[in-house]
């Protein structure tokens, strides 16, 4: 069952859900809590590789990922990140989110941004029970104009759904959890899938 705004506030107040810094009352409405854009980004370099073999040898995959991903870009206050049409970039939320083992989170982009062509998460919008960290966003500009993205702008909204019971294997206890406690725009760790 999705939590209402009343229950989101209740769960935040009693610490069952933690969002740091805590959202103001104005940031919680209906069934969501607003999240803002952080100041860390990562882009894809122009490259000449014909393809990236996602199931190939681990060392080759790591080498390919290193050649196509930029170092992390950290914006100073007042700076903007420009996402051009057809570009994919990674970013993080300003807020750190921590979920218990019996709640799953769902991140949705804002309709107002989607109407300008901005996809906030390409496919990964589930936030697993037991998650703790900033959320990495997979931005894609499907519009016709470059978009200026600034830290602290409202970027998405998160809803929360209670499970029938706590997970036996929440994210924070999994040995194979690749993005545990992330606080930066972490690139794909697909080579760790083995």
Curated annotation (Swiss-Prot):
Top-level taxon in the UniProt lineage: Bacteria
Stated name of the protein: dCTP deaminase
Organism of origin: Pseudoalteromonas translucida (strain TAC 125)
Gene Ontology process terms (BP): dUMP biosynthetic process; dUTP biosynthetic process; nucleobase-containing small molecule interconversion
GO molecular function, one term: dCTP deaminase activity
Enzyme Commission identifier(s): 3.5.4.13
Pathway: Pyrimidine metabolism; dUMP biosynthesis; dUMP from dCTP (dUTP route): step 1/2
Pfam families reported for this sequence: DCD
Self-association and partners: Homotrimer.
Function per UniProt: Catalyzes the deamination of dCTP to dUTP.
Cross-referenced CDD domains: trimeric_dUTPase
Gene that specifies this protein: dcd
